[in-house]
Structures are given as C-alpha cells and as structure tokens.
C-alpha cells in the first residue's frame, strides 16, 4: 500500500531496441503517483531512435544502429535521462 506523500521516484531503465521495432515502457511505475502525471519525452538523436508518449506509456522506436539519450520530463518537475541502444538484433522486450 502506498501512503500518500511518501515514496520516491525509481530510476527509469536504459533500453535496448532492435532496428525497425518498438519497445514500450509504462512510466507511471517509475514516478510517485505516476498514474496522475503527464510525460514529455525527447530523443537526442531521432536518426537513431524516436520516442512518443501515449498517456503513461513511452514508445521507443529503433531507427538505426547506435545509441542516444532519451529525456523524460514529468509534470511534477522531475526529469530523467536514459540511454537507448539500437542494435540490429534485440528481442521485443528490450533485451538482447
């Protein structure tokens, strides 16, 4: 049970994505009261990976082999950056 006003944000994990595929992550799991927040995500290099947000879900699309930073900004003022690595082969859950 979550006690109102308690808790702390968790670290959003780095991700692996295969070229031409997508991987989803529910951001609400990583921020206190996450289901009540809004999220904005940006990719440092959209030629490597693009990112979109639908509700609490972040979708990362692998464009070409390489690595880039994805920045997650949250309506409560929190911000985290992760590394997304795109490889020719990775499975659909982000693991190699």
Regions found by a protein language model. Give the residues of each.
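Extracytoplasmic soluble-region selector
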Residues: 1-96
């Amino acid at each position: 049970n979550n006690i109102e006003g308690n808790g702390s944000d968790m670290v959003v994990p780095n991700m692996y994505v295969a070229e031409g595929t997508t991987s989803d992550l529910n951001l609400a799991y990583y921020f206190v009261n996450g289901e009540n927040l809004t999220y904005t995500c940006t990719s440092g290099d959209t030629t490597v990976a693009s990112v979109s947000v639908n509700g609490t879900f972040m979708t990362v699309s692998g464009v070409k082999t390489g690595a880039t930073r994805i920045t997650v900004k949250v309506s409560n003022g929190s911000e985290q950056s992760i590394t997304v690595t795109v490889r020719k082969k990775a499975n659909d859950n982000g693991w190699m």
